[in-house]
Structures are given as C-alpha cells and as structure tokens.
Amino acid sequence: MKKQKVDKEDILIMTYAENGTFNIGVKVVGKGTAEISQFEPGLLVDCLGPLGNGFDFEGYDNVILTGGGTGVFPINFAYETLTSNGKNVTVCEGFRNASQVILNKPSYILTTDCGDCGIKGTVIAGLDTIDISDPSKTLICCVGPIPMMKAVSAWADEKGMNCLVSMEQRMACGAGICLCCTVKVKDEGSDGFKNVRCCKEGPVFDSREVIWS
C-alpha cells in the first residue's frame, strides 16, 4: 500500500456503512485539505479518533438537527443513524447561496441567506417553520459556524428546548495536551468561567453552558 504524509486535519464523518467503511466530508481551505481531496484508492491513512464526546439523544422523542457549512457532514451522519433506529428527526440546513448547497435531501428544510434556493434567511427562518408540540421532549443539535450556533442556542432557549452544540475548534494534538482547542464555558468559580478542551470534554456541549463571544 502507498503511504503519504500530510499535516493533521480535523475530519468529519459523513456516512457510515455496516461493512466498516465510512465517507468523510472535506472542504478545501488550505494545503492539508487540498492534499486530502486528492487521495486515491489504496492510500494508507493514519487516523486518530473518534475524539471527545458525542450527541446524547436519550430521553427525547423528537430531534432537530441543524447544520451549516461543513457542519452538514456530521448532521447527515446523525440523521442516517437516528432514522435507522426509528427516531423522529427533522433536519434544517443553512447555506449562503445555492452554489454551496450540499447533502440536501427532499425531507430536509433548506435555507439560503440570499433566498436563491429554499427559504430565504438563516437557519432560524427554517426552524420557525417547525411545529414543536412538546419542547421538553424535543432536542435540538447544531453544528456549524459560531454565529449560527449562537443564534440557534438563543432560539432553543426561547422555545424552552435543550440544545447541544458541537464546537469546531481545531484539534492540533488530539490528546488534550496542547490546549489549542479550548472552549470557554460557565463555571461557579471566582472567574465565572473555565476553559475546557474540545478533544476531551467536548466537542459537544450544552449550549447554555457555552460563553458565546
């Protein structure tokens, strides 16, 4: 097998098959992701993971999955996993415009900032179309840019719903040593906050605990 060295990159699982294979989603933004996008079949790749925690859906009858940007990759994975287990799932995706839309299914709620595809507006416009009969039994999970997750967190709080967010901080070492992936969360200590590691304590957090900048 061929082996190729590239810099470490945070990778998001997009789909998973029962035969042990999975697909990843990559957005080319630099040298490392550009190299990954050119990988050919048969290349040997070293992976470290999965890192940290994940979404906990236990105790909820309904789940709303919200994604934007590269956040739609894990949202798609969660959708396939939940629906295969009989969960009632609603997906809302947000993009800047039609040219950036990926992984959209007919059952998904689609929004674009400029309105050239789907509902015009942010994902909040899409979430407002969902009929939520029992907020206490509905969980919303969100992955995407910080401003989007902050807005979804506020929306969920207003509706009286629990919200989990998956922070996309870059994980340099993946072992909890380098502290590059810290997130500021609320704490009862004297400072009122503490820094926790995405690769260990995260990347999924209760949105009410995150201190949004």
Regions found by a protein language model. Name each.
Residues 15, 25-27, 46-48, 92, ...:
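Residues in well-ordered beta-strands of folded domains
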Residues 1-41:
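Ferredoxin-reductase
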Residues 74, 146-147, 168-203:
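Local cysteine-cluster metal-coordination motifs and their immediate loop/turn environment
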Residues 21, 44, 196:
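A residue-level signal for beta-strand positions that form part of recognition/binding surfaces
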Residues 4-11, 62, 84, 88, ...:
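Iron-sulfur (Fe-S) cluster-binding modules
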Residues 120-121, 196, 208-211:
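Short, charged, solvent-exposed linker or helix-capping segments at domain edges/interfaces
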